[in-house]
UniProtKB/Swiss-Prot annotation:
Encoding gene per record: bioB
GO biological process: biotin biosynthetic process
Organism classification: Bacteria, Bacillati, Actinomycetota, Actinomycetes, Mycobacteriales
Catalytic activity annotation: (4R,5S)-dethiobiotin + (sulfur carrier)-SH + 2 reduced [2Fe-2S]-[ferredoxin] + 2 S-adenosyl-L-methionine = (sulfur carrier)-H + biotin + 2 5'-deoxyadenosine + 2 L-methionine + 2 oxidized [2Fe-2S]-[ferredoxin]
A Pfam entry, by short name: BATS
Residues involved in [4Fe-4S] cluster binding: 70, 74, 77
Protein name, entry field: Biotin synthase
Length: 334
């Protein structure tokens, strides 16, 4: 009697051997795997990551150039000016950005991402970001990424010319669930910005937040929609409910579902950098974070996030050392 192939058997052939991501229906099977098969999923996802992405972990620091006062209503975000949130509008000057980049580089990070809480940049923000990128590159050996909202073609071209090597604009969630998360702009607007970024030659970075109330079907849909972007990087956040936001009372995502999701995203995007981002400390804790780093994740944000505290950088660096995970460096000195 022939034993029917499981989804993990299929993934070994399709993803590990051939480098072809799973489709939406296949991802649903991964997301509903029984708990006792999660270790097998993590092991397979790790093998896929090693084969198609290599063994190095990329480390990134982020900083907010403009915090708070955003006119959009993203229901998870405490930086919206529409909610009763404790976050207030603050701008950083260029010397502070350069110093933050220097401190980030000292951790071994190869990327420094400058973020602003806006729908899209005005001329003041564009000019300040261009000047900041040039100033950082003149003093720090680190790549600079940016995330300043929706862009038009002229703005995309200016950022590329200034030396921004990667642009982040998260799709946030599945297209079918997006109206439950944001009402002041559309999923398609975000997608169009990413198209322009790719055309300009910058690397595309787009992910989202899991555990916002989406169904498993929508989580699988989201993974496939991200894969269609052919992104260089996908940040994986897990909802950390923020006081004063519409999602303040949402429950934390179950750690087992988070691990299944990480495995599923790796099997959907075998060649893509999957970056640990916000909420992992609460959702997964130390043990779950270690499982994920040996289960498909190959990049991390270290230090604090935009409006929430992360783990101390030293703790994350110690964890990677304990797991014997090499950190990517910009230049290898022989």
């Amino acid at each position: 009697m022939t034993i029917p192939a499981t989804i993990l058997d299929t993934a070994r052939t399709q993803v590990l051997e051939q480098g072809i991501g799973l489709n939406q229906q296949q991802l649903m099977e991964v997301l509903t795997l029984p708990e006792e098969q999660i270790p097998d999923l993590m092991e397979l996802a790790h093998q896929v990551r090693l084969k198609w992405c290599g063994e190095e972990i990329e480390v990134e620091g982020i900083i907010s150039l403009k915090t708070g006062g955003c006119p959009e209503d993203c229901h998870f975000c405490s930086q919206s000016g529409l909610f009763e949130s404790p976050v207030r509008s603050v701008w950083l000057d260029i010397p502070n950005l350069v110093e933050a980049a220097k401190q980030t580089a000292k951790t071994g990070a190869t990327e420094f991402c400058i973020v602003a809480a806006v729908k899209g940049p005005d001329e003041r923000l564009m000019t300040q970001l261009e000047e900041a990128v040039l100033a950082i590159h003149s003093e720090v050996e680190i790549e600079v990424a940016a995330s300043i909202g929706t862009l038009n073609k002229e703005q995309v071209d200016r950022l590329a010319a200034a030396g921004v090597h990667r642009y982040n604009h998260n799709l946030e969630t599945a297209r079918s669930y997006f109206p439950e998360v944001v009402t002041t702009h559309t999923w398609e607007e975000r997608r169009e910005t990413l198209r322009l970024v790719a055309e300009a030659g910058m690397e595309v970075c787009s992910g989202g937040i899991l555990g916002m109330g989406e169904t498993l079907e929508q989580r699988a849909e989201f993974a496939v929609q991200l894969a269609e972007l052919d992104p260089h990087e996908v940040p994986m956040n897990f909802l950390d409910p923020r006081p004063g936001t519409p999602f303040a009372d949402r429950e934390l995502m179950d750690s087992r579902d988070a691990l299944r999701s990480i495995g599923a995203f790796r099997l959907a995007m075998p060649h893509t950098m999957l970056r640990f981002a916000g909420g992992r400390e609460l959702t997964l804790g130390d043990k779950g974070s270690e499982q994920a780093l040996l289960g498909g994740i190959n990049a991390m944000i270290v230090g604090n996030y935009l409006t929430t505290l992360g783990r101390p950088m030293e703790d994350d660096l110690d964890m990677m050392d304990r797991l014997q995970l090499p950190i990517k460096v910009l230049n290898k000195v022989i």
